[in-house]
From Swiss-Prot:
The gene is cwc22. Residues 667-677, 813-824, 855-868 have a biased composition (Basic residues). Keywords: Cytoplasm, mRNA processing, mRNA splicing, Nucleus, Spliceosome. Associated with the spliceosome. Residues 626-635 have a biased composition (Pro residues). GO terms for cellular component: catalytic step 2 spliceosome; cytoplasm. Residues 53-96 have a biased composition (Basic and acidic residues). Disulfide bonds: none annotated. PROSITE patterns: MI. This is Pre-mRNA-splicing factor cwc22. Residues 427-543 form the MI domain. InterPro entries: ARM-type_fold (IPR016024), CWC22_splicing_factor (IPR050781), Initiation_fac_eIF4g_MI (IPR003891), MIF4G-like_typ-3 (IPR003890). Residues 145-328 form the MIF4G domain.
Amino acid sequence: MSDSVVLQSAVRVPTPPPGASYSPQPSGSRKRSPPSRSPSPNRRRSPPGDTADADRDVPRIDPERAIERERQLAERVRQYEQQEAARKPLTEEEKQAAAKAEYEKLLNMRSGGTYIPPARLRALQAQITDKTSKEYQRMAWEALKKSINGLINKVNVSNIKYIVPELFGENLVRGRGLFCRSIMKAQAASLPFTPIYAAMAAIVNTKLPQVGELLLSRLIIQFRKAFKRNDKAVCISSTTFIAHLCNQQVVHEMLAAQILLLLLHKPTDDSVEIAVGLTREVGQHLEEMSGPIALAVFDQFRNILHEADIDKRVQYMIEVLFQVRKDRYKDNPAIKEELDLVEEEDQITHRIGLDDEIETQDGLNIFKYDPQWEEHEEAYKKLKAEILGEGSDDEDESGEDDESSDEESEEERQMDIKDQSNTDLVNLRRTIYLTIMSSIDFEECCHKLMKISLPAGLEPELPSMIIECCSQERTYSKFYGLIGERFAKINRLWSDLFENAFAKYYDTIHRYETNRLRNIARFFGHMLSTDALGWHVLSVIHLNEEETTSSSRIFIKILFQDLAEHLGLPKLRERMTDELLRPSFEGLFPTDNPRNTRFSINYFTSIGFGVLTEELREFLKNMPKPEVPALPPARSPSVSSRSSYSSRSRSSSYSYSRSPSYSRSPSRSRSRRRSISRGRSYSRSVSGSSRRSYTRSSYTPSRSRSPAPRSRRRSVSYSRSLSRSRSSPRRTRRGRTDSRSPPPRRSLSRSVSRSLTPPRRGGRARSYSRSPSRSLSRSVSPPPRRASARRRYSSESISPPGRARRSIPGSRSPRRPPPSRRARNYSVSRSPSPRYGRNQRRRNSSPSRSPSPPPRRRPRSPSTPPRR
């Protein structure tokens, strides 16, 4: 009982209002019964109607408490009004602080918290304008993340060219971690879009290599982890992305080779399947860039196919891979044409190995406060201007700008179509032509031409039209030369264009007829003589037989004649010997090859400008002599050199024969002599010398077995042969011998032979006769002296070496003439002279008529010294 009393005393009973009591009498609101231990009976609540009417007049509110509550409410209202009044001067700062606090609270709130409408969030963000605050930077970071993620999700083949500039508009240096995470996530979710993501990454890598390097690092780390965990899906996505980056040359193909060798080192069904997929994507690029690596990979596949214990499905995949390789990857090109957006020289290739120590820089994925945020943003704005151009900062994405850009693109397309029809070019040429033809003098013409607005890139049309109009005239008009001179001296641009025109017209001068060629040459002659063009333009001329045509030689001739007419020959020679311009004239006066040097000398001499080649002649005279090869043995057959420059040698012979004679007379000579004579001479000569002559006769091969005499003798021969001989007696000891009998010491020949060569010293005469020779000859010419044997171009020597002897000719002259290098033979021989051997005499007679006029004396060639 005591407990119950304590319990009752512990309860605070409120004071009843006046006129009311808490007695156990029934009340209108609730009935209470005294505590009883017996269970209470089921009682119904009495209807409240009667009690409510009874208590309606009783007041329930304490007036004092009501007054107190009213007073407190008024006090709170007054305090609130005072606070509001005191808060007005610091509105902005407090708004900023309140907005920051609320934004921070919202960002840190767990997911599932209070929903914030976008309009309220934007209004809240608009209130935060302090760029140095952490809240503003966090807000910008969130916007950057959403923008990069949205652009990557929108990209496809058709719009990649438009998405990439927008992507560069975002700060990819600050958000490179966000970019890499977003593009890797998008690629793993949609593998068919991997080439598009790789192309986007390749474009970004050309301008921001650190972004491409970070992407590669994360892909390699991702592959390593997935390979260790046997995560096939992640391995496939990582290797596919790396393969396409390798195709785009963002990463070196060595990385793909390392991954393939790792996968095939211990082949399993999954690893071989991943390797097959990687090879199909990167195989074409591997074979183009690293053939040995591709061969090693396919050899490994072949070994796995034949030896490894793998599933039938994987074996079939390897066989399909070999078929793809056989088809040259026609269904798996390295780069599709529409995604080949990066020039090869612009791409930056990273060399990262599979086993290198790599940092993924995961801290770039989360927000960090940047104290120098504004400076970094300004730096990226400059970089963006360099990447996209200066006008990219002011671009707006409104519909009006889109419409205007569409209109501009349509106008550009129309312009392209118009340009391709060459209508503008034809109109421009017509305008220039009419302007030139309607002008009275060159000054008026230049003034009108300067007013013509030339489109960009069509400036060369003006010099071209001036030269074309000049070439169309019947005779050269100085009017055009003055126009060209004026333009070339007005601006360096026109001077360069005329220099380019000179090179172009010289290369194509063979297309013009002679009259047009003459006008063009005189036009450029005027330009050079007035120094409107630099003389270095003559460096395009290479004066030699191979690089010139008849038209170009005529052009050079007329050009130099015009220069000589304007400048005078002394001044022209002075200009040609100018030390500063000498390198430009190396093509006109070549010193690299004696043949080209002679060609230049002969050319300028023939056109009347031999004075310009004096230094070239001196150079040719002093140039080192060619080495003469050693003489072969006397009995060995030798073939002398053939040279093509026979016209410059004293002993050059041009003779033509009509009757070849073949002699089969026996002789005891040690050689079978063959002579080829082109002589057509009618001569009467009494030559008392047995000479071994070397002749260029008219291809009358003869086989003579008559012995060659070794003693002094006097032979009288009377030959009559129709031959024209320009050959001079020469002493050559090299020939082609075929000896069959020793030569006799004396011989007396008496033959009628058709000889086409004059007698010579130093060589064995190649004569052709069919009968034993007994000849009685009348000699009117003294024997020639030993002429220096020269090796000439385009000459054939097939005579054996022999000894030259003096002969005592029976001549009609009262005294012996002085020895000379050339002999004049006018002999009429009806029989060849008999030659006597040591033991027997051979006779052969062959009818011949060989009138030979005296050869003309030619100057010694400076390139071939005489041999003694």
